């Protein structure tokens, strides 16, 4: 049986605190203390029925808070001091008994002090006032110690310092939790999944993942949360409060996590590194989730369909597929989203915000994924490698499409002519030949395009803009893909090799045209005479015969020709 000290079942006041109590509050205190003595007597201890009121009649008596000292000590060893001896103890009959019950809500407590603190949560039923008021923010406290701890949030004082890493803390409890991260101590284990946690409060919050309990409900929208900190952050979406500001650019955020994530764009600091692949993270929790990619662990399982997830937030978002819940609604267009990241990215469509800026060229992006992919154009990094031929790519989609060259898969088929394609982009481009229609139209010449990027590149043929310059020879290009291909003329790289004859090519179009010599394929057919060609350039030259088009003119005599070979032959006449 556990032994408890008298302080465990008592509540006390300093002389100053007692003076602040109203007569009705003093009466309540006496009633509660007398009830305590009755409880003690009922479990076998002999207690004299004290006159509680007499404790406070003598001004010289010293009532002390819970410091291990006597609750009430008379100057000359009065009867009061005898009755309140700190060495007295009682024995619990049954472990886990909670004898102190709140008369307002029925909640029970092990200690009377816990009950008295709880009673203050009920409006109009405070045991006593909160005499300690903060001058900075006007927050009031019942206890001097609580007030002193709060003051540190304004002064910045952090008296608890970790000997391992030097990190400092305002409060003792977070300091204790932090120390466990060094020794790896996690004494609180979940009975459902076996996950171990460093503190009891974290275990309680974690257990709600299994039970589905969400005790914290937003009064504005009714949304419920499993954790008190989550509802505090959520409430700011209604109030518009953003208390965490970036010191670099002044941008404000609703949560501390958000501002730390944002800070990466300035300093790139990621202290938590994966031992498997070297990837770094801002928070240890992010690293733990990432490590599950390597271990294959997926501890969060959907009760509806059985699908498992590495991260608790992922399962929460997934569950909305079953419920149909889309809590994030755009105020501009009314579109709703099930996940906050998708909603935030969408909002930038309206605001035009592009928070991710490239330090090399100044180009800005609305998504961090787009920004990271763009960075590879400067670093030359191509992390996605084909296991068949060793070719590397910037993007995973490019690798996926490339693999179809090896497998022969062409999943996109034209319903008009039954022609098939390895990529959706090629298929859409082909469809324009049938429909003559595309969503992006050039204002100068009326040419249509499927993608806005293709239109932008095309517009440069009108403006003459060539933003991509070769560092080797200074030649400039209107498109990034053109400069990549051009660089091969300097390096000698010829990545496109014919398996039939071994001939290699710099340009993919040259390689494709060459392959048709072996296959005999001639996809470009003249509508006028029915003649077919393996190369598009040959087809274009041929159509000039029917159109009587002669775009190539001799500078010497002005004679015009439809093809370059005829012009070259003619030029030899002048050079004789």
From Swiss-Prot:
Q: Return the InterPro entries for the record.
A: Ikaros_C2H2-ZF, KRAB, KRAB_dom_sf, Znf_C2H2_sf, Znf_C2H2_type
**Parts of the chain that traverse the membrane:** none
- Superkingdom: Eukaryota
Q: Please tell me one Gene Ontology term that the record gives under cellular component.
A: nucleus
The UniProt record lists the keyword Ligase: no
Biological-process GO terms, alphabetical: regulation of transcription by RNA polymerase II
Compartment(s):
Nucleus
Name the UniProt key words of this record, in alphabetical order: DNA-binding, Metal-binding, Nucleus, Repeat, Transcription, Transcription regulation, Zinc, Zinc-finger
KRAB domain residues are 4-90
Question: Chief subcellular site?
Answer: nucleus
Under the heading PROSITE patterns, the entry gives:
KRAB, ZINC_FINGER_C2H2_1, ZINC_FINGER_C2H2_2
Q: Where are the zinc fingers (C2H2-type)?
A: 100-122, 132-154, 160-182, 188-210, 216-238, 244-266, 272-294, 300-322, 328-350, 356-378, 384-406, 412-434, 440-462, 468-490, 496-518, 524-546, 552-574
Q: What does this protein do?
A: May be involved in transcriptional regulation.
The text of the family note is: Belongs to the krueppel C2H2-type zinc-finger protein family.
Q: What is this protein called?
A: Zinc finger protein 791
- Source lineage: Eukaryota, Metazoa, Chordata, Craniata, Vertebrata
């Amino acid at each position: 049986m556990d032994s408890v000290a008298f302080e465990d079942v008592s509540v006390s006041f300093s002389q100053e605190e007692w003076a602040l109590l109203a007569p009705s509050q003093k009466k309540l205190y006496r009633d509660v203390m007398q009830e305590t003595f009755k409880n003690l007597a009922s479990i076998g201890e002999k207690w004299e029925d004290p006159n509680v009121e007499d404790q406070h009649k003598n001004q010289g008596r010293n009532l002390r808070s819970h410091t291990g000292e006597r609750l009430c000590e008379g100057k000359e060893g009065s009867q009061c001091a005898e009755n309140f001896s700190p060495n007295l103890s009682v024995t619990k009959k049954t472990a886990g008994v909670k004898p102190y019950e709140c008369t307002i809500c029925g909640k029970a407590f092990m200690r009377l002090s816990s009950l008295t603190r709880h009673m203050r949560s009920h409006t109009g039923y405070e045991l006593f006032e909160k005499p300690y008021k903060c001058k900075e923010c006007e927050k009031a406290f019942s206890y001097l110690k609580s007030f002193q701890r709060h003051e540190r949030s304004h002064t910045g004082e952090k008296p608890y310092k970790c000997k391992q890493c030097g990190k400092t803390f305002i409060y003792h409890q977070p300091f204790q939790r932090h120390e466990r991260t060094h020794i790896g101590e996690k004494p609180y284990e979940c009975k459902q999944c076996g996950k171990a946690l460093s503190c009891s409060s974290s275990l309680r919050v974690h257990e709600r993942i299994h039970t589905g309990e969400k005790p914290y409900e937003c009064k504005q929208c009714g949304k419920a949360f499993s954790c008190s900190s989550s509802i505090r952050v959520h409430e700011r979406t209604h109030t518009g409060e953003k208390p965490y500001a970036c010191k670099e650019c002044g941008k404000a955020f609703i949560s501390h996590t958000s501002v730390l994530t944002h800070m990466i764009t300035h300093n790139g600091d990621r202290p938590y590194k994966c031992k498997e692949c070297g990837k770094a993270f801002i928070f240890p929790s992010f690293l733990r989730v990432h490590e599950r990619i390597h271990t294959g662990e997926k501890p969060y399982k959907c009760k509806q369909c059985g699908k498992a997830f590495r991260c608790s937030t992922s399962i929460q978002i997934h569950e909305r597929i079953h419920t149909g819940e889309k809590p994030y609604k755009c105020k501009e267009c009314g579109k709703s989203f099930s996940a906050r990241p998708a909603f935030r990215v969408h909002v930038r469509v309206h605001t035009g915000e592009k928070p991710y800026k490239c330090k090399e060229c100044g180009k800005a992006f609305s998504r961090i994924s787009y920004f990271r992919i763009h960075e590879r154009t400067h670093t030359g990094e191509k992390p996605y490698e084909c296991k068949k031929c060793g070719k590397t790519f910037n993007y995973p989609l490019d690798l996926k499409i490339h693999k179809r060259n090896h497998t022969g898969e062409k999943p996109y088929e034209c319903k008009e002519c039954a022609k098939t394609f390895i990529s959706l982009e090629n298929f859409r481009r082909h469809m324009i030949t049938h429909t003559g229609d595309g969503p992006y139209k050039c204002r100068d010449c009326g040419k249509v395009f499927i993608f806005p990027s293709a239109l932008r590149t095309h517009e440069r043929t009108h403006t003459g803009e060539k933003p991509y310059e070769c560092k080797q020879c200074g030649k400039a290009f209107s498109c990034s893909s053109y400069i990549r291909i051009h660089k091969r003329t300097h390096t000698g790289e010829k990545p496109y090799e014919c398996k039939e004859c071994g001939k290699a090519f710099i340009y993919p179009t040259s390689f494709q045209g060459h392959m048709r010599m072996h296959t005999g394929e001639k996809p470009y057919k003249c509508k006028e005479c029915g003649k077919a060609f393996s190369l598009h350039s040959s087809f274009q030259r041929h159509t000039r015969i029917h159109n009587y088009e002669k775009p190539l003119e001799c500078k010497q005599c002005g004679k015009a020709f439809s093809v370059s070979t005829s012009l070259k032959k003619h030029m030899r006449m002048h050079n004789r």
